[in-house]
């Protein structure tokens, strides 16, 4: 009986120490991971809106993001959301437009999260990816210039995906064999456009 109790006590101590060690390692790695994610996001923001010197979150935009969730879902862009909105500013503080982070859960493998730049004149400055895990050689081609650069300079209007050559100024040519991904990216972009056009300043 004493042997059993001793073994149980030893096992308990080992488990406790292991748990504490794992917890400590987790806490130690959290900060570097967060910093790496922030650095990657900042790099994407600059690629999407290169003219901007800085990006600023405001209470007004944060409130608009929260208030517009149901309205955006009702627009028929798919299962999309606007996750974040920032003002894109020049060096002198003048407003150049907005940097919008939006998501769709309708990629072939689920979540696709993008950042979209939209100027005050109503044009897209570019599109970048914050999260995407689509099929290599198919959906992951969304990150290739042939697909994502189609959005550069487009008018901020409702966009549509076409499987053939884009013939209208609101059409995005789908990635061959990756229609789900193409529609997810375009749906998230439409959510970002709708947000800026209809929810900012309400």
Regions found by a protein language model. Name each.
Residues 2-202:
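Flexible, solvent-exposed loop/hinge segments and secondary-structure transition points
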């Amino acid at each position: 009986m004493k042997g059993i109790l001793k073994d149980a006590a030893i096992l308990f101590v080992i488990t406790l120490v292991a748990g504490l060690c794992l917890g400590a390692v987790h806490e130690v790695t959290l900060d570097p991971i967060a910093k790496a994610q922030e650095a990657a996001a900042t790099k994407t923001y600059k690629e999407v809106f290169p003219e901007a010197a800085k990006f600023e979150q405001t209470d007004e935009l944060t409130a608009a993001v929260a208030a517009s969730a149901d309205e955006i879902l009702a627009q028929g862009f798919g299962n999309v959301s606007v996750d974040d909105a920032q003002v894109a500013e020049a060096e002198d503080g003048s407003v150049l437009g907005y940097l919008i982070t939006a998501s769709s859960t309708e990629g072939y493998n689920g979540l696709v999260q993008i950042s979209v730049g939209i100027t005050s004149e109503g044009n897209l400055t570019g599109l970048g990816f914050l999260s995407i895990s689509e099929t290599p050689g198919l959906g992951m081609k969304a990150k290739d210039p042939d697909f994502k650069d189609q959005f550069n300079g487009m008018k901020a209007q409702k966009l549509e995906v076409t499987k053939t050559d884009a013939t209208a100024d609101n059409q995005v040519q789908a990635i061959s064999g990756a229609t789900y991904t193409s529609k997810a990216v375009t749906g998230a972009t439409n959510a970002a456009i709708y947000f800026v056009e209809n929810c900012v300043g309400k």
